[in-house]
C-alpha cells in the first residue's frame, strides 16, 4: 500500500509543481522596476502571416537596468515588432534604431505598482486554488481507497495528513514567491 501512497504523493507533487511553474511564468510577465527579458515573453509579432512569439523573430537583451534591446533578425520585421511591443499593454514605448529596437522602461508610478502588486496577488491566489484542487483530488482518492477497504481509517488519516503537509508546503512556497515579487514590484 505504501507504493500506492508514494505514487499518489508523486502525482500530487507533480501537479502542485505545475501550479508553481505557472505562477512563476505569470510573475515573470509582471513588470518590476528592473529590466527583464521575460517581460516581453507575452508579445506576439505579426510575422509572415501568423502571430509569432517575439523570441522567434528577435533576440531580447538587457544592456542596462532600465533598458531592453530587441535585435530583430529580419529587417522587414522591425515595424511589426515595434507595433507589437507598443500594443502589448505593458505601457512600453519602443524606439527603433535600424534593426535594433531600444525599449526604455519608465519608472513605475505608485498607482501602477499597486496595480501590479494586486495582479501578483491574484496570480498567487489562482495558484493556491489550483493547489487546493489537487489536494481535494488526493483526499477523494484516499476516501475511495477507504470505501473499497483497500486501506483502513487510520492509514487513511495518515495519508491525508501527508497530503495536507504537501499542500501546506506548496502554499507556503507560493506565499514566499508572492512576498518576493511584491518586494520587487514596490522597489523604486
From Swiss-Prot:
GO cellular component, one term: cytosol
GO molecular function: ribosomal large subunit binding
Entry's localization field: Cytoplasm
Family matches, as SUPFAM superfamilies: Ribosome recycling factor, RRF (SSF55194)
Superkingdom of the organism of origin: Bacteria
Keywords for the protein's UniProt record, in alphabetical order: Cytoplasm, Protein biosynthesis
GO terms, biological process: cytoplasmic translational termination
Gene3D superfamilies: 3.30.1360.40, Ribosome-recycling factor (1.10.132.20)
Family membership noted in the UniProt record: Belongs to the RRF family.
NCBIfam families: frr
Biological function: Responsible for the release of ribosomes from messenger RNA at the termination of protein biosynthesis. May increase the efficiency of translation by recycling ribosomes from one round of translation to another.
PANTHER family on file: MITOCHONDRIAL RIBOSOME RECYCLING FACTOR PSEUDO 1, RIBOSOME RECYCLING FACTOR
Protein name as it appears in the record: Ribosome-recycling factor
Species of origin: Acidiphilium cryptum (strain JF-5)
Amino acid at each position: 500500500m505504501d507504493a500506492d501512497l508514494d505514487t499518489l504523493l508523486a502525482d500530487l507533487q507533480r501537479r502542485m509543481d505545475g501550479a508553481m511553474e505557472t505562477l512563476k511564468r505569470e510573475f515573470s510577465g509582471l513588470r518590476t522596476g528592473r529590466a527583464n527579458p521575460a517581460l516581453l515573453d507575452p508579445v506576439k509579432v505579426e510575422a509572415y502571416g501568423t502571430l509569432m512569439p517575439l523570441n522567434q523573430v528577435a533576440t531580447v537583451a538587457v544592456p542596462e537596468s532600465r533598458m531592453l534591446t530587441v535585435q530583430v533578425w529580419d529587417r522587414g520585421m522591425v515595424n511589426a515588432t515595434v507595433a507589437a511591443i507598443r500594443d502589448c499593454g505593458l505601457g512600453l514605448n519602443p524606439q527603433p534604431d535600424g534593426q535594433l529596437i531600444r525599449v526604455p522602461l519608465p519608472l513605475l508610478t505608485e498607482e501602477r505598482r499597486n496595480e501590479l502588486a494586486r495582479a501578483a496577488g491574484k496570480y498567487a491566489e489562482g495558484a493556491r486554488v489550483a493547489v487546493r484542487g489537487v489536494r481535494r483530488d488526493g483526499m477523494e482518492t484516499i476516501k475511495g481507497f477507504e470505501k473499497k477497504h483497500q486501506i483502513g481509517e487510520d492509514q487513511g488519516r495518515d495519508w491525508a495528513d501527508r497530503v495536507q503537509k504537501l499542500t501546506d508546503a506548496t502554499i507556503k512556497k507560493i506565499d514566499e514567491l508572492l512576498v518576493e515579487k511584491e518586494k520587487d514590484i514596490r522597489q523604486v
